Amino acid sequence: VTASPLQGSAESLARPVEVLAGTDLDEHKSGTLGDTVAKLPGVQSTFFGPGVGRPIIRGQEGPRVQVLSNGVGNMDASTVSADHATSIEPFLADQIEVLKGPATLLFGSGAIGGAVNVVDGRIASELPDRPLSGRAELRGNSVNDERSGMFRLDGVNGNWVLHVDGLVRDTD
């Protein structure tokens, strides 16, 4: 038996969260959101062919797992039909949060199995500290002959913020 000298809040105990960001996210990125988070404990990916992978959290999938983009529900056909890919692109993500347990009910009854929130910066939550910033990424995969590229630019002028991103993927 072990004890902690620091008392945790009830919310932190009931809120198991996995966060992929930075180098961890770069190493986990895959062609689908499900494949990107599949290496986390308790998480798997559906498979209905290449390019279609939605998260399965603790055995729950489909409408029981809420997929969010910047905290807003993703209304796409992947929720009700397994042969549709989710419209959220993991290559553009700044961080991906996977929530499991009772705290997911804060996102509504549709999140009874869990929630995956992709934070991609498309909607600015604060003014950037630099007038112009960006990133680009190129990837290749010899197994499925994949070639993909991504770019992102963020700019600020006074109280106006501009965000532009793009992705191209070619695979066999």
Can you describe what each PLM-predicted range is?
Residues 66, 95-99, 115-172:
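Predominantly transmembrane beta-strands of Gram-negative outer membrane beta-barrel pores used
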Residues 1-127:
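Acidic, small-polar-rich N-terminal luminal/periplasmic segments of exported/outer-membrane proteins
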